[in-house]
Amino acid sequence: MKLEYYTSLNHNPHYNLALEKHLMESCPEATIRFYLWQNEHTVVIGNNQSAQSEVHLAKLKEDKGTLARRTSGGGAVYHDLGNLNFSFIGDDSVFDIPRQMQMIAQALCDRGYNAQVNGRNDIEVDGAKVSGNA
């Protein structure tokens, strides 16, 4: 198995989501790609969500925010430079969601945080959600 690491220094959500899609579509077999990025003032919605139902669009526009849609499902999430986004990308033969989530929780524990994975693939610290994963 090969591990590849990517970081985007671009804070444009459309660029970052397009790069994530490209990394997914071009990922070779037996490879895991780990991708890190940050977006400026953005609401990202899932592929099947209605922006009108999920986002206060007038307020987002007033605040000069950006609306973006990811290709995967999941709920609406707010991004800014205070949070770090990550993706594990790989085919089913190398990808193990519980294992990946446990690795992240363990890394947080190693840094002194009381982190654990809950039943929805979210990571919690002291019972508060710090990472949602799809």
What are these regions (language model features)?
Residues 1-95:
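N-terminal lobe of the biotin/lipoate ligase/transferase fold
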Residues 81-134:
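Catalytic beta-strand/loop module used to bind and position nucleotide/cofactor moieties
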